[in-house]
């Protein structure tokens, strides 16, 4: 297990040579921040239709666009298990019948990696940059992060701590898969939510969540929800967490931030062979300990 803690903006873990780890779906939070920077700069509005589609950027970011997800396909799971190369994106959409919306945008909720693939394409179109360069210029670099990049090949993942995913083709993550040190994930989220990369209004929009039912067995959530690229919800003690959990072959990452008055803490944990709930529980324990120590 690897972990990193930021308390009141200061990295608590000692300086060390850190391994790279896959950020899995925490990448969505980075993509959301990049997309919201486009809103900040007037290149698009949250409620504008995206790429000539019937859904808006807000609906994509919050998984309300009506899109399906390739995780529903048995042949997808079989191909990943067999270490097969990723299908081209157009083949994935054809196999999924991805152009057929599953519900009218804005009327339901369905977690969709395909939605974030649309967001990645939108970022490239509106910036006239590659996704790599757009994310670096608009999100990573402004927040002081430099050792984070997209994994493009199996060889890229072989450089990470997650040995069990070394034969996994990162192109299966159609919206892109970031890799970086665990401390950089904690710093990214903490700085995103407490600096002026995005204006207060956009940060409020980002953290305005759609409530998704009640407590989840084996997870810390009492009222889980999803905002614009962030998992947002309450836990025991009346605290509200904001961040994201991600999982891939053999490993899980969870990155969350909590505030209590003027105090804040942000924890990132990566573990191989663990469940999402187990890793989230470690994050919650670290956050609560950090708040107690500040008290």
Role assignments for model-derived ranges:
Residues 104-108, 121-126, 175-176, 217:
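Short helix-to-loop capping/linker segments positioned immediately adjacent to catalytic or ligand/cofactor-binding
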Residues 10-13, 37-55, 126-154, 199-204:
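Short, well-structured active-site flanking segments
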Residues 103, 152, 156-158, 282:
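A beta-strand edge to alpha-helix "cap/lid" segment located at domain peripheries
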Residues 24-43, 60, 96-97, 110-139, ...:
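Alpha-helical scaffold elements that line and support the substrate/ligand-binding pocket
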Residues 2, 7-10, 15-111:
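Active-site-proximal loop and beta-strand segments within enzyme catalytic domains
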């Amino acid at each position: 297990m690897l972990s990193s803690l930021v308390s009141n903006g200061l990295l608590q873990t000692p300086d060390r040579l850190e391994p790279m780890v896959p950020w899995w779906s925490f990448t969505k939070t980075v993509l959301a921040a990049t997309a919201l920077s486009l809103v900040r700069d007037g290149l698009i509005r949250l409620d504008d239709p995206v790429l000539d589609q019937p859904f808006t950027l807000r609906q994509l970011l919050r998984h309300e666009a009506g899109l399906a997800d390739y995780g529903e396909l048995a042949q997808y799971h079989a191909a990943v298990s067999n270490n097969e190369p990723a299908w081209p994106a157009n083949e994935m959409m054809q196999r999924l019948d991805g152009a057929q919306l599953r519900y009218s945008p804005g009327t339901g909720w369905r977690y969709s990696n395909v939605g974030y693939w649309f967001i990645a394409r939108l970022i490239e179109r509106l910036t006239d940059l590659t996704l790599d360069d757009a994310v670096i210029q608009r999100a990573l670099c402004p927040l002081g992060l430099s050792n984070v990049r997209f994994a493009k090949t199996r060889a890229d993942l072989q450089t990470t701590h997650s040995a069990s995913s070394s034969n996994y083709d990162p192109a299966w993550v159609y919206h892109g898969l970031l890799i970086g040190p665990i401390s950089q994930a904690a710093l990214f989220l903490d700085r995103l939510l407490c600096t002026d990369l995005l204006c207060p209004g956009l940060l409020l929009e980002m953290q305005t969540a759609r409530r998704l039912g009640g407590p989840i067995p084996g997870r810390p959530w009492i009222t889980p929800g999803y905002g614009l690229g962030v998992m947002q919800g309450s836990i025991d003690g009346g605290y509200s967490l904001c961040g994201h959990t991600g999982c891939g072959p053999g490993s899980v990452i969870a990155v969350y931030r909590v505030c209590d008055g003027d105090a804040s803490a942000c924890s990132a944990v990566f573990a191989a062979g663990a469940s999402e709930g187990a890793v989230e529980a470690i994050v919650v324990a670290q956050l609560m300990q950090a708040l107690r120590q500040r008290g």
